[in-house]
Structures are given as C-alpha cells and as structure tokens.
From Swiss-Prot:
UniProt KW keywords: DNA damage, DNA recombination, DNA repair
Record's signal peptide: none
GO CC annotations on file: bacterial nucleoid
InterPro entries: ARFGAP/RecO (IPR037278), DNA_rep/recomb_RecO_N (IPR022572), NA-bd_OB-fold (IPR012340), RecO (IPR003717), RecO_C (IPR042242)
Gene Ontology terms describing biological process: DNA recombination; double-strand break repair
Protein name, entry field: DNA repair protein RecO
Role of this protein: Involved in DNA repair and RecF pathway recombination.
Family, as annotated: Belongs to the RecO family.
HAMAP family: RecO
Length: 251
C-alpha cells in the first residue's frame, strides 16, 4: 500500500554502499523512518532530495516497521540552510534535539511547529544559535528535567536581579547572597539568566525577531549543553561539529 506524508527530514543515515535511511517528522508531529534505495546514486535524483531539512510530500510503501520510499514531491529544498556551515550545524542540532526527545510512536504537533519555526527563522537570518537555544529550553521536560531560571534554588526567592550563578550542587540558579555555599558554582550573568527565563516561558507564536549579544548566546549554549549532559546524560552529535568550528575560529 502506498502512503503519502508531508514532512521535513530530520535525520539521514547511510546504509550500505548506495542506500540510506531517512527519518521525516510529519506535519502531525510523528516520526516516519524510510528506507531510500539507491539514494547515493546521482542518476536517481534522490541524492539532493533526501538531505536534512528537505520539506516535501513523501510517497512510500508501508511495510512492517520501515517504509520504502517511492518518490518525493519537494515543497521546499531549504537549500539556503546548507549554504552556511554555522547555520547548517545549529539547524542540525535543532533537528537532533527534537528527534531524540521523541519516542518512536510519539505524536506531537508542537514538535513539528517548533522545528518549522526554527528553520524558517534561520532562513530569515535570525541567529541559528539562538534557535538551538530555544529548542534546548523548550525540550527539557522531554529529557526528564526542568530548571527554574527566575528564582534562587536555595532561598526560593523570586528576585531575578540577584541571580548570578548556576549550582549543580543545588540543582538550580543561586543568588549572590548564597554564592559562598557552592565554591564550584558556575558564574552566569544576570542578563543571561533573565533572557533564558523569558525564552523558556514565551510561546514561540509570540516570539518576534530577536537580537541577543553573541557573548550571551555563548553563555546560554554552554550552560544548556552542560545541563543536558548532567541531567540526561546526552551529548548531541551535532554539537561536536559546532565545538570544532569554535576551536578553529579561536586559532
């Protein structure tokens, strides 16, 4: 039986010499894994159309478990997302976070909306790094943890202006009054914590174009990646390339 699904490719893995397995996130928010025969043979026309971020109508034979791709009617190649290595890397991180946050049979329309929001904003030249930060903030509960960025984890006071660090000992942000209780607390600027709280709580439908200083973006990213490693044991493969790019830039 032939099935039709509109969706965006969020994962692509080579399989053997000429095939690949892709995963699409369909418009209902379900993951659909598909085998693509002869995908790496240029004459098939599937090489370009089975890359990350391609949005299309996927027509496939439904088998037990893995579907077999028959053809793709491309809606948007999202080619511009692959032109800049930084944009591409952070867009891949967004897709990977959403992919890993979902069980195989899970359906979440929010996940598709979140992915589409991030890819569209990157194409509109919003910071790709900021988009990955938004996804990391929004998807925390799916990985089994949550952080309040608006109150001290020791006193539970909500005076945002006094928050200056994150403590793994106390599993949250702490105010300047209690900084001596954890000598290993990570200093985080108050503005960074304030903006993380805003981005975590603000619905994506209400987010206008955002412009945040690069130093603050870096501080957010570094903290969030540490949180995910500490509380969920996950390190995202896409982050490895981002780290390599940072090291090259620093030389």
């Amino acid at each position: 039986m032939l099935m039709k699904q509109k969706g965006i490719i969020i994962k692509s893995v080579d399989y053997g010499e000429s095939d690949k397995i892709i995963t699409i996130l369909n418009e209902n928010g379900a993951k659909v894994p598909l085998m693509v025969k002869r995908a790496k043979k240029s004459k098939t026309g599937l090489q370009a159309n089975t890359q990350l971020f391609v949005h299309g109508l996927f027509i496939y034979a439904k088998l037990r478990g893995l579907g077999i791709l028959n053809s793709i009617d491309v809606i948007n190649q999202n080619y511009q997302l692959r032109l800049d290595i930084y944009d591409s890397s952070f867009a891949a991180l967004c897709a990977e976070i959403i992919d890993k946050s979902m069980e195989d049979e899970e359906i979440s329309n929010f996940n598709f909306k979140l992915l589409e929001f991030c890819l569209n904003r990157i194409k509109e030249k919003d910071s790709a790094q900021l988009m990955s930060i938004i996804v990391l903030l929004k998807k925390m509960p799916s990985f089994g943890f949550s952080i309040d960025f608006d109150k001290c984890s020791i006193s539970e006071e909500n005076d945002q202006s006094k928050l200056i660090a994150f403590s793994f000992k106390y599993h949250g942000v702490i105010s300047e009054q209690y900084i001596d209780r954890d000598p290993h607390a990570i200093n985080i600027s108050n503005k960074t914590l304030y903006l993380m709280d805003i981005l975590q709580k603000l619905p994506i439908d209400n987010m206008n174009h955002l412009n945040i200083h690069q130093n603050i973006l870096n501080e957010m990213s570094d903290l969030l990646i540490m949180l995910y490693r500490e509380y969920s044991g996950i390190f995202f493969k896409s982050q490895k390339l981002i780290n390599q790019l940072k090291r090259l830039e620093a030389k």
